[in-house]
Curated annotation (Swiss-Prot):
One of its GO terms (biological process) is generative cell differentiation. This is Retinoblastoma-related protein 1. Induction: The polycomb repressive complex 2 (PRC2) containing MSI1, MEA, FIS2 and FIE repress the paternal RBR allele during pollen and seed development. Down-regulated by TCP15. It is found in: Nucleus. It comes from Arabidopsis thaliana (Mouse-ear cress). One of its GO terms (cellular component) is DRM complex. The modification Phosphoserine is found at residues 885, 898. PANTHER family: RE32990P-RELATED, RETINOBLASTOMA-ASSOCIATED PROTEIN RB -RELATED.
Length: 1013
């Protein structure tokens, strides 16, 4: 079979002298680093030179000069992070020179967005070298994900602050006074003062747990301070006129309550944060606080002064410059990787343009995929630029009656659910849950509460366990960290008990018994439930220091374990906000696409029982999981740890038969089948939002008992059929993988505008690969296999579809990560045994040619050319099928996405229409755009005639289409939302599409899509 050729780029010269000289110049002349740091950077460059040469075409634009600059940045950042850690451990002493990531990027003329887009390749490909030089824990010490999360959070918070400032204060170009220049300068200074005071609050008061919700409260507290200190003439609102302010009797407006109403904040929490901000003003700026009730100033007119603090001359035009200098110095003294002041300077090229994926940060919002970092050219034209909407009048607050949802506002709304629904619950099992716990073979209430305390303490440690992550200089920091951790533990614990009780009730209904001993005494089940509860709390507050999969590492479970409870968790908590449901769904998708296939996954412990033929390869690759650390070991770690990694530090393991073993480990080879536990997965959907499109019969069926999902793999399946629990679990797991692959294949087919036959062939090919060449997915991403399946089917079908086109369209998929096609894992030892020498990770074209095709060629040949023979189809059509109807697809049922394309040739879209919407949407002028099942599209016709007419129109593209639906490729798509705007908008879209198509000349073979906004 013909091989696809990877692009050729000039390698780094063998001696690398020119590159080393360039790196040395940057270290010595630009960054002024000391000799030891320069030597360390040169050593790391020398060790990774071979990797750099092999990665030239995959980094940045592929030019040697740009690739070198990126590689230098990766090396300097690694040396900075890892050598500083060495100094802290007392192993070495670095020089007096201090540098951070922003200085590195400025020296190399790179921006933060591009740096973090390319960094994962360096982490993957140079990981072995970094491990040899800096130790096995180098990745945790590098903190690349934490710094990226910090950048994303600051981008969101700066926009949140900018938006709030513009709502309450005038923009400088809206001031038409004679001294407009001075007024503009003051407003800019006030804007900068607020941001610097927020950074001081964030660095001093939120040192370790810089979560988005707490920081959002910090932004709101800064707005409160600005409102009562900025002169009234700069306000963009009138307290007396605004309906959004909460009035407190005759005393005036309750400012804190009003801000909580506007921003969905907690009044108690906001008052605490305001007090901390006031303390910083007193400590750093040396301003004397006074109770607002004792001050006479027009800034407090019509505002209830109770509980407010006022600082004389804090933001007067004569003193603000001095305050700015003091805050700048305070910020400079607190060293960090990012210069967080740049986020209010829209002209700073360091921020970069484009978007940075927030997947690692799990930022949820109104859309599943969010451009967390928009282009500064659009967003930061001016920090105080006026609203573009004509509705933005002088009274900015009353004019903006409903703010559009943002990631920050969504986080605040979700936190409100925790505050109002979960927090009022008792932090112990309810009487209903206690009934189930006491109905077991013995009363296990104490066991459940003790486990919850230990596991949640491990996930949310006190400051003594996490001091190495801290910053800031004020003594109240540790106390606030401990309070924050205790609040999060309580929230997770209450949520855990609430959902556990609901699950027990459902399980008792299925089993017709209250004794759930098998489930409730299972250690792994409870840890999965606690991890899921804690992850929801972390996702709500969006922390920087505890990103997923932190809950897996700290509880001792694996990705495969957690995937067993996610869908059931969603099902049994009805009040769960939509954004948290989406988070769990996307998390399950992330687990299934790659994490369950990683080395050390407990999935392999079931796979060698269900598929004994794979046991040898699994053992040779060292893929099996280690036993799960015991609860006593985790408890001892909490009591004596100095903050080290939980998973890697635990030595004691469970030996009791009732405690299910298995934690991810790249080192242990477990060959005792009797120790393999916990692998039955009884859930039906990998991604509930997208894949829970089951038929009515299936949706009414009771789910299998939960306890069977956590039974020993070698145990016979209680449901019968002669299978072990491992075989049943792997079959269900493969079904979920196939469903996830079906959705992604369907999305790619629509983007590439391929036929239904190609879609079915790609899906069948993937099914065969999963079932018969399962090892191709070991330590890889399922998208890598899907992309190879597309190209393989294209070649066997003699289609003119290149890998370049496939990857180009894959980039537009919401789940796309460049690392998927730039870095595919290959077993270097196996390659050497076969006489090939190469790196551990290669690009997808090399993987396709050297690994994929040799393994699947017999399967691909079986598919044969994809035929579109109408005669064959007619001879084999099912009995009773309507003449001319397309054949029934073997492709699995996927969700009804609105609108859904049903033809690869014509622009035909189908959107589900509820009966409640029909009368409102379908008027006489728009009815012809819809074909409703059971309702005729023409007078005096039957539904069967309508269906036949639709088939004839689809199958006869040359017929006269007078007064019929327009199926031309240039016709505009009509969706539900467009119908409400009547025919004018539809005709405009058709004319626009037609002019675009006619002006484009030759049509491009690839489908063009609008970019995400």
């Amino acid at each position: 079979m013909e091989e696809v050729q990877p692009p050729v780029t000039p390698p780094i010269e063998p001696n690398g002298k020119r590159s080393e000289a360039s790196l040395l110049d940057i270290c010595e002349k630009v960054l002024s680093l000391d000799g030891s740091t320069c030597d360390e950077a040169l050593k790391l460059f020398t060790e990774t030179k071979r990797i750099l040469s092999a990665s030239m075409s995959n980094i940045g634009s592929g030019t040697r000069e740009e690739v070198e600059r990126f590689w230098f940045a990766f090396i300097l950042y690694s040396v900075k992070r890892l050598s500083v850690r060495k100094e802290a451990d007392g192993l070495s002493v670095s020089g007096d020179n201090e540098f951070n990531l922003c200085q590195i990027l400025r020296a190399l003329k790179l921006n933060i967005v591009d740096f973090f887009k390319e960094l994962p390749q360096f982490v993957v490909k140079a990981g072995s070298v970094l491990g040899e030089l800096y130790g096995a824990d180098w990745e945790n010490r590098l903190q690349a994900k934490e710094v990226q999360a910090n950048f994303v959070h600051l981008s969101l918070l700066s926009k949140y602050y900018k938006r709030g400032f513009r709502e309450f204060f005038l923009t400088y170009d809206a001031n038409a006074e004679k001294n407009s220049a001075n007024s503009s300068t003051y407003l800019l200074d006030s804007y900068r003062f607020g941001w610097l005071l927020f950074l001081a609050l964030r660095n001093h008061a939120f040192s370790r747990f810089k979560d988005l919700v707490t920081c959002s409260n910090g932004v709101v507290s800064i707005l409160a301070i600005l409102i009562i200190h900025v002169p009234c003439r700069f306000r963009n609102f009138s307290i007396q006129d605004s309906s959004r302010f909460v009035k407190k009797g005759d005393k005036g407006v309750d400012l804190v309550a009003s801000l909580c109403k506007i921003y969905d904040a907690s009044e108690d929490e906001l008052r605490i944060v305001i007090d901390k901000a006031n303390n910083l003003v007193e400590t750093i700026l040396k301003k004397k606080p006074s109770p607002a009730s004792e001050c006479q100033t027009d800034k407090l007119d019509n505002i209830d002064p109770d509980g407010l603090t006022y600082f004389e001359d804090l933001l007067e035009e004569t003193s603000i410059s001095t305050s700015l200098i003091t805050l700048e110095k305070d910020y400079y003294d607190g060293k960090g990787e990012l210069d967080e002041r740049v986020f209010i300077n829209e002209e700073d090229s360091l921020l970069g343009s484009g978007s940075l994926s927030a997947g690692a940060v799990n930022i949820t919002g109104v859309k599943r995929k969010i451009d967390a970092l928009s282009s500064p050219a659009r967003t930061f034209i001016s920090p105080l630029s006026p609203h573009k909407s004509p509705a933005a009048k002088t009274n900015g607050i009353s004019g903006a009656t409903k703010l559009a949802a943002t990631p920050v506002s969504t986080a605040m709304t979700t936190a409100k659910w925790l505050r109002t629904v979960i927090s009022p619950l008792l932090p112990k099992p309810s009487p209903g849950l206690e009934h189930f716990l006491k109905s077991c073979d013995r009363d296990i209430t104490n066991d459940v509460t003790r486990r919850a305390h230990i596991i949640l303490e491990a996930i949310f440690p006190n400051s003594s366990l996490g001091a190495q992550c801290g910053g800031g200089s004020l003594q109240a920091v540790d106390l606030m960290d401990d309070i924050w951790a205790e609040q999060r533990r309580l929230e997770a614990c209450k949520l855990y008990y609430r959902v556990l009780e609901a699950m027990c009730k459902a399980e008792a209904q299925i089993l017709h018994a209250n004794n759930l001993n098998s489930l409730l005494t299972n250690e792994r089940f409870h840890r999965c439930m606690l991890a899921c509860s804690a992850e929801l709390v972390l996702a709500t507050h969006k922390t920087i220091t505890m990103l997923f999969p932190a809950v897996l590492e700290r509880t001792g479970i694996t990705a495969f374990d957690l995937s067993k409870v996610i869908e059931s968790f969603i099902r049994h908590e009805d009040s769960l906000p939509r954004e948290l449901r989406r988070h769990l769904n996307s998390l399950e998708e992330r687990l299934l696409e790659s994490m369950v296939w990683e080395k050390g996954s407990s999935m392999y412990n079931s796979l060698i029982v269900a598929r004994p033929s794979l046991a040898l390869e699994i053992n040779q690759l060292g893929l099996l999981a280690e036993p799960m650390p015991s609860l006593d070991a985790i408890a001892a770690l909490i009591n004596f740890s100095d903050g080290a990694n939980h998973a890697s530090s635990v030595q004691k393991h469970e030996t009791c038969p009732g405690q299910n073993g298995g934690i991810r480990s790249p080192k242990r080879l477990c060959t005792d089948y009797r120790s393999i536990l916990v692998e039955r997965n009884s859930f039906t959907s990998p991604v509930k939002d997208r894949l829970l499109a089951l038929g009515n019969v299936k949706s009414k069926m009771l789910p299998p008992p939960l306890q069977s999902a956590f039974a020993s793999p070698t145990r016979p399946n209680p449901g019968g059929g002669g299978e072990t629990c491992a075989e049943t679990g792997i079959n269900i797991f493969f079904t979920k993988i196939n469903k996830l692959a079906a959705v992604r294949i369907n999305g790619m087919v629509e983007r590439l505008q391929l036929s239904q036959q190609i879609r079915e062939s790609v899906y069948c090919f993937f099914q065969h690969v999963l079932a018969q060449r399962t090892s191709l997915l070991f330590s890889r991403h399922i998208d890598q296999i899907i992309l190879c399946c597309f190209y393989g089917v294209a070649k066997i079908s003699q289609m003119s579809l290149t890998f370049r086109e496939i990857i180009y369209n894959y980039r537009k998929q919401p789940q796309c990560k460049p690392l998927v096609f730039r870095s595919v894992y290959v077993d270097a030892l196996q390659c050497r045994r076969q006489g090939r020498i190469g790196p551990d990770h290669v690009d997808i074209i090399t993987f396709y040619n050297e690994i994929f095709i040799p393994a699947v060629k017999p399967l691909l040949v079986e598919l044969g050319p994809v035929r579109n023979d109408r005669a064959v189809e007619a001879n084999n059509k099912p009995e009773g099928q309507c003449p001319g109807s397309p054949k029934v697809s073997v492709f699995p049922s996927v969700p009804d996405m609105s609108p859904k394309k049903v033809s690869a040739v014509h622009n035909v879209y189908v959107s589900p229409l509820r009966g409640s919407k029909m009368d409102a949407l379908i008027s006489h002028s728009t009815k012809s755009y819809y074909a409703c099942v059971g309702e005729s599209t023409h007078a005096y016709q039957s539904p069967s005639k309508d269906l036949s007419a639709i088939n004839n129109r689809l199958n006869n593209s040359s017929s006269n289409r007078k007064r019929t639906l327009n199926f031309d490729a240039e016709a505009g798509m009509v969706s539900d939302s467009m119908v409400a705007n009547s025919l004018n908008l539809q005709n405009q879209n058709q004319n626009q599409n037609g002019s675009d198509a006619s002006s484009s000349g030759g049509a491009a073979p690839l489908k063009t899509e609008p970019t995400d906004s």
